[in-house]
Amino acid sequence: MAGWNAYIDSLMADGTCQDAAIVGYKDSPSVWAAVPGKTFVSITPAEVGVLVGKDRSSFFVNGLTLGGQKCSVIRDSLLQDGEFTMDLRTKSTGGAPTFNVTVTMTAKTLVLLMGKEGVHGGLINKKCYEMASHLRRSQY
């Protein structure tokens, strides 16, 4: 899906994000495009299943993983019409910095963004939401 890489380039262009991915979640979940060598390129079908699944309470207690990176859920509106967003924060290991993550949903895809250190979650959310809105208008 080489055409999807242009969307990743667009999301990464302003330098506020360190990782981005577009993941297809219908039928057989898979990463359509992602930043090479980063976390989101390794997202598994099981991780996608947790994101889009009906159980919306367990990850508030246990967190969830994206590409093996543990995350805490801050706000879950992923399945709410008009919202379609989930805000997360990476969990720290050994005092490492944590980062804001937003996941947005379209009819066929999940758009994931991870901000750089110190980048406000609201900025990441807005950028991710705008890309998802564009994809929804394009019937994705």
From Swiss-Prot:
The modification Phosphotyrosine is found at Y129. InterPro entries: PFN, PFN_euk, PFN_sf, Profilin1/2/3_vertebrate, Profilin_CS. It holds the Pfam family Profilin. GO terms for biological process: actin polymerization or depolymerization; cellular response to growth factor stimulus; modification of postsynaptic actin cytoskeleton; modulation of chemical synaptic transmission; negative regulation of actin filament bundle assembly; negative regulation of actin filament polymerization; negative regulation of stress fiber assembly; neural tube closure. The keyword Glycosyltransferase does not apply. The modification Phosphoserine is found at S28, S57, S138. It is found in: Cytoplasm, Cytoskeleton. PROSITE patterns: PROFILIN. This is Profilin-1. There is a cross-link at K54 (Glycyl lysine isopeptide (Lys-Gly) (interchain with G-Cter in ubiquitin)). It comes from Rattus norvegicus (Rat).
